[in-house]
Amino acid sequence: MVATVNPEAASGITIGYSVGSVADWLRRITVCIRGARGSRGSGVIWRPGLVVTNAHVASGNVNSLEFFDGRKAQGRLLARDTDIDLAAIEIDARDVATAAVRSARELRAGEMVIAIGNPWDGEGALSAGILHRAAGTQPVIFADIRLAPGNSGGPLADARGNVIGINSAIFRGLGCAIASDEVTKFLSRSGVMEAA
């Protein structure tokens, strides 16, 4: 059985998608972030001009970013919180797709989840799994999904392509992501973006 999905994209176009097409969409909103020492991670284009990633990925005031289509840009660090492992980066790129975000509070255990990131040399690599337990109001989402270091900062999404969290770590074999609601709080608290 092939799941059909219907992400409400920034373009406003509504089309049914296969899981593969959802992955293609997620690649469009995911950037590769390269560190000064050759490290690499991922980030999510949260809105035009703004990328969200992990604090441990955003290693300096200026970060080198690469988009899915090969374009490159320099990013400027706007905010960083090592306690919750989130960072916000400003980019000078307005003609880009942006994430459709879903509250993690709506999630149910067993839902299919998809991660996109840049592990090893696999730019835009796909991993899929299921939600380990309902997130509720918890700040972290746990999923039975295979993540690698380059997935850090990239999107964890539902089967419709909605971003539900930012991939952050691996704990006892489970993928861990910071819930989208925590990202919203971080952006509001740091003055980057008003609370929705």
Set out the residue ranges of the language-model regions:
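Active-site substrate-binding loop(s) of clan PA
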Residues: 21-22, 66, 76-78, 90-123, ...
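A conserved glycine-rich beta-strand in the N-terminal activation segment of trypsin-fold
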Residues: 14-20, 29-48, 54, 71-74, ...
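Short, conserved beta-turn/loop elements at beta-strand boundaries and strand-helix junctions
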Residues: 38, 48, 59, 80-84, ...
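Short, surface-exposed secondary-structure boundary micro-motifs
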Residues: 36, 54-56, 118-119, 168-169
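Active-site region of chymotrypsin-like
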Residues: 26-32, 87-101, 122-196
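Short, well-ordered loop/turn sites that connect or cap secondary structure elements
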Residues: 46, 58-59, 107, 157
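N-terminal targeting leaders that route proteins to membranes or the secretory/organellar pathways
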Residues: 1-24, 163, 186-196
